[in-house]
UniProtKB/Swiss-Prot annotation:
Pfam families: tRNA-synt_2 (PF00152), tRNA_anti-codon (PF01336). Mg(2+) 1 binds at E407, E414. It is found in: Cytoplasm. Belongs to the class-II aminoacyl-tRNA synthetase family. This is Lysine--tRNA ligase. Mg(2+) 2 binds at E414. GO terms for biological process: lysyl-tRNA aminoacylation. It comes from Rhizobium meliloti (strain 1021). GO terms for cellular component: cytosol.
Length: 498
């Protein structure tokens, strides 16, 4: 407890002291939480405007700034005031500051938000400073800030109380500023490529476009069970059918009622786009241009660090077929295997446990995940996926078990997934029926055919290339963030016990 706190008869408990100061402030000045405050410059604008001011010089100009008090020295004579753009020093001298400003100083705690009007000067040590002539209390903080020099180290508290994390950890603040810049750059890139942005339903009566467990809800007025979408694909394809645009995209949230990990959050951001009269080869080029553009937006170059790795987003990226990659890793030539049982036996011979009813394509994909995926550090396109696991992609000519699909990998993570989209309505129906039967076999009895989507396909959809990008994972790479929770402002967490 400070001498001034003791003199004022305040409690020794930090939180109680703040509440008592709030009561005193209400008595002294009335409104402690005013609705409006006019500042003339942000801290960054002030620093830029007076960058040429020499040490030990007064500007002769008065400004008004506002922000949160982060440090206080010499009984409040010096304070560091932070706004979203940066820091400025505030000086209040007992001999020069007006009485009203001096009287307010003992009531100011770290974390309070104040407004300051005064003359700009640069100290002998070169610190840009505002000499306070007027101080306005804008928001009295009732809780102490985390300790200045150690920041907010506890990882759980950082995720649960993100506002504190950003308040005191400059690295976290920068990361979320970068996230905003990346999403803006992604949107601008797609618009420059001629794509039109749309918004499709989050609540869907039939979930589809991916294989995942949905979140279920109920619409009371419509008396209808609905699902938070797992993907926007089937609605975006309806737009291609409509002729509204030949290039469409959406950046929005998907929801999957599945596991949580350093790479998975049940609510996540996806970019999906569809490009009429293009195929997966065209989309590979689009991905390479996109990655290069985003790296330049964040780093000013295409090479950057992720952990102990040096990554390069400079295209073109290598391309490898899934069967070839698995053959290189295991020696198994899947194209020479003719049946599901041959594939399962080959996996068992390689020491890999496989489900007893796994298909040829499922075995191939599983071995890829187990033996190849983690080795793909630099960006690479893995092409020619099994048709068994790709119900919306066109077959590879001459190899009916494979489809024109690729996934883009980096750091061993899947970042993008793309197809030459299937537009044969008869084949599409057959594959979706098969997909529904497989879902029912897994116990997903609510899975049904989206007949409206199939009607749209019967109307005719142009050939197209489609792409989905996991925006969160891409941001993780570009911001050197090892966990998806580091780049989602408010990640899903288990409820904290009382």
């Amino acid at each position: 407890m400070t001498d001034k706190t003791q003199a004022a008869g305040l409690s020794s408990d930090a939180t109680e002291v703040r509440s008592q100061k709030l009561d005193l402030l209400r008595q002294q000045i009335g409104d402690v939480y005013p609705a409006h405050f006019h500042r003339t410059l942000t801290n960054a604008e002030l620093a830029e405007k007076y960058a040429g001011l020499e040490p030990d010089t007064e500007s002769g100009e008065t400004v008004t700034v506002a922000g949160r008090v982060f440090s206080s020295r010499n009984s409040g004579m010096f304070m560091d005031l932070h706004d979203a753009s940066g820091k400025i020093q505030i000086f209040s001298h007992k001999d020069t500051a007006p009485e009203e400003a001096r009287a307010l100083l003992p009531m100011i705690d770290l974390g309070d938000i104040i407004g300051v009007t005064g003359e700009v000067r640069r100290t002998k040590r070169g610190e840009l400073t505002v000499n306070a002539k007027e101080i306005t209390m804008l928001c009295k903080s009732l809780l102490p800030m985390p300790e200045k020099y150690h920041g907010l180290a506890d990882i759980e508290t950082r995720y649960r109380k993100r506002y504190l994390d950003i308040m005191v950890n400059e690295e976290s603040k920068l990361r979320f500023q970068q996230r905003s810049r990346i999403v803006s750059s992604l949107r601008r890139f797609l618009e420059d490529e001629g794509f039109m942005e749309v918004e499709t339903p989050m609540l869907q009566p039939i979930y589809g476009g991916a294989t995942a467990e949905p979140f279920k809800t109920h619409h009371n007025t419509l008396k209808l069970d609905m699902y938070l979408r797992i993907a926007p694909e089937l609605y975006l394809k309806r737009i291609l059918v409509s002729g509204l645009t030949d290039k469409v995209f959406e950046i929005n949230r998907n929801f999957r009622n599945e596991g949580v990990s350093t790479r998975h959050n049940p609510e996540f951001t996806m970019m999906e786009c569809y490009w009429a009269y293009a195929d997966y080869e065209d989309v590979m080029g689009l991905v390479e241009r996109m990655f290069e553009t985003l790296a330049l937006a964040v780093h000013g170059k295409t090479e950057f660090e992720f952990g102990d790795k040096q990554l390069s987003f400079k295209g073109p990226f290598p391309r490898v077929s899934m069967p070839a990659a698995v053959k290189d890793a295991t020696g198994i030539d899947f194209l020479a295997l003719k049946s599901d049982e041959e594939a399962r036996q080959a996996a068992r011979d390689a020491g890999v446990e496989i489900e007893k009813d796994a298909t040829w394509g499922e075995v191939l994909a599983f071995l890829f995940e187990e033996k190849v995926e983690a080795t793909l550090i630099q960006p690479a396109h893995v092409i020619h996926f099994p048709k068994d696991i790709s119900p919306f992609a066109k077959e590879v000519p001459g190899e009916p078990r494979l489809v024109e699909r690729f996934e883009t990998y980096c750091n061993g993570w899947e970042i993008g997934n793309a197809f030459s989209e299937l537009n044969d309505p008869v084949e599409q129906r057959a594959r979706m029926v098969e997909q529904m039967e497989q879902a029912h076999a897994r116990g997903e009895k609510e899975k049904t055919l989206d007949e409206d989507f199939l009607d749209a396909m019967d109307q005719g959809m142009p050939p197209a290339g489609g792409l989905g990008i996991g925006v969160d994972r891409l941001i993780m790479l570009l911001t050197n963030s090892p966990s998806i929770r580091d780049i989602i402002l408010f990640p899903a967490r288990r409820q904290k016990a009382d």
